[in-house]
Amino acid sequence: MSAIVPEIRSADLLRYTVIGSRRPSVYFWAVALTGGGLGFTLAGLSSYLHRNLLPFSDPASLVFIPQGIAMLFYGVLGSLAGLYQWLSLYWNLGGGYNEFDRRTQKITLVRQGFPGKNREVRLEYDFADVQSLRVELREGLNPRRAIYLRVKGRGDIPLTGVGQPPPLTEIENQAAEIARFLNVSLEGI
């Protein structure tokens, strides 16, 4: 699954949806952490109450200190980590869009954050302030494929989301399309 997905393409408007935390891997970890955390919590409580709360094993025979309390501790930690994953999915952290509008000569980057006063992070830049588009390609153990917008006085601003790096051809095509649309140079390819 790509980190940025084209949503609108026209002569005057180019808009890409950026996938935030709603990726398959986050769903997997939310389910795994919640299930594991709940299992460990029930095992720890079973050893404390001397009553079996799990249908597939008999943790009531465990000694509460140290085994039961350790399982309870790890179960609570796992459940909290699972809750965080579910909340990040619900809030769609990091999700948003990149919009390039020729009519207004503006670039709008929008991302979702944590709830509160500044939940929506919105950055706007003029076409005239854009120096170039830069593509970062790094292979190896921790691969990185990203597109950056180089803006005068602001440095490099990432346009791609986090997660699994998209295929090389997809990054190259997206970067070339955005560079043509903005009429700026493309660096790094």
From Swiss-Prot:
GO process terms (BP): photosynthesis
Keywords, ordered alphabetically: Membrane, Photosynthesis, Thylakoid, Transmembrane, Transmembrane helix
Cellular location(s): Cellular thylakoid membrane
Family: Belongs to the Ycf4 family.
Recorded topology in the membrane: Multi-pass membrane protein
GO cellular component: photosystem I; plasma membrane-derived thylakoid membrane
Role played: Seems to be required for the assembly of the photosystem I complex.
Name under which the protein is recorded: Photosystem I assembly protein Ycf4
Membrane spanning residue stretches: 25-45, 62-82
A Pfam family recorded for this sequence: Ycf4
InterPro entries attached to this UniProt entry: PSI_Ycf4_assembly
Organism listed in the record: Synechococcus sp. (strain JA-2-3B'a(2-13)) (Cyanobacteria bacterium Yellowstone B-Prime)
